[in-house]
């Protein structure tokens, strides 16, 4: 399948985890993918291994405006446009409320929410030039579940969803769609470094479909929303969590 042939995409957080799985999928379907990550070496290694042969990497701190501007300039200088943005970069913390400091709050907001804003600000300007765009933001099903011990993370991911819906309203006339995918607990490198690694069996009991989520389970929904086929869908939130959240 080559449904992204001729399309240029940026995927943040693509050195590992869900971001990398998404970038790999878009690349395998003929997109020209920029693997963007604060871990520039990791992004470069991932891009080198990508199927399709046209991937490249740019190191980027998405919480830093100058770094985000430089990323988009690099993409335009190399390929002349931007069609697809997937905001997958995130910090996944585990901090009980009584231990949550303002500095920790800001650390998470800087990456998860500020980063999404900064990436969208640069990307939308480029997409408007072409009269086409797909933005897919990775939120979380924790915003519906009220997951404890990570209030700042939940707030940041809820902000991403609300932000995306507001953008969708403003950008429809520009033929730019903005949607959110809300994964459940997913077995990634980041999760394995937190206490969440011990929660899979409990979460499985809440799921309609049994099993442990992997990055590959999230990819198809993102790829669809990033494609031309999803032109009539915007401002939506799709929980991809084996039916843990049902409404």
Regions found by a protein language model. Name each.
Residues 29-45:
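Conserved glycine-rich Rossmann-like NAD(P)H-binding loop of the short-chain dehydrogenase/reductase
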Residues 140:
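Residue(s) in the substrate-gating loop at a strand-loop-helix junction
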Residues 96-97, 104-106, 191, 203:
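Substrate-binding pocket helix/loop in short-chain dehydrogenase/reductase
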Residues 95-98, 145-151, 173-174, 210, ...:
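Active-site loop immediately N-terminal to the catalytic Tyr-X3-Lys motif
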Residues 145, 223, 234-247:
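Short C-terminal tail/terminal secondary-structure segment
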Residues 125, 169-173, 231:
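Alpha-helical segment proximal to the catalytic Tyr-Lys
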Residues 120, 156, 164:
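Active-site helix of classical SDR
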């Amino acid at each position: 399948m080559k449904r992204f042939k001729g399309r240029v995409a940026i995927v943040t957080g693509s050195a590992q985890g869900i971001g990398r799985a998404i970038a790999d999928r878009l690349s395998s379907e003929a997109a020209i993918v920029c693997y963007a990550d604060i871990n520039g070496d990791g992004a470069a290694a991932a891009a080198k291994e990508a199927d399709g042969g046209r991937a490249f990497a740019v190191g980027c701190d998405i919480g830093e405006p100058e770094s985000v501007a430089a990323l988009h300039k690099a993409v335009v200088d190399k390929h002349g446009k931007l069609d697809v943005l997937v905001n997958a970069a995130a910090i996944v913390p585990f901090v009980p409320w009584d231990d949550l400091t303002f500095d920790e709050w800001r650390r998470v907001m800087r990456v998860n929410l500020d980063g999404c804003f900064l990436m969208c600000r640069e990307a939308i300007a480029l997409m408007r030039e072409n009269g086409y765009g797909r933005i897919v933001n990775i939120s979380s099903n924790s915003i519906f579940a009220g997951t404890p011990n990570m209030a700042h993370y939940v707030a940041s991911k809820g902000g991403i969803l609300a932000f995306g819906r507001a953008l969708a309203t403003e950008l429809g006339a520009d033929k730019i769609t903005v949607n959110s995918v809300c994964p459940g607990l997913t077995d990634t490198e980041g999760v394995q470094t937190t206490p969440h690694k011990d929660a899979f069996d409990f979460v499985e009991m809440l799921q309609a479909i049994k099993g442990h989520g992997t990055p590959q389970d999230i990819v198809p929904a993102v790829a669809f929303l990033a494609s031309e086929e999803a032109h009539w869908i915007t401002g939506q939130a799709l929980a991809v969590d084996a039916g843990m959240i049902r409404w």
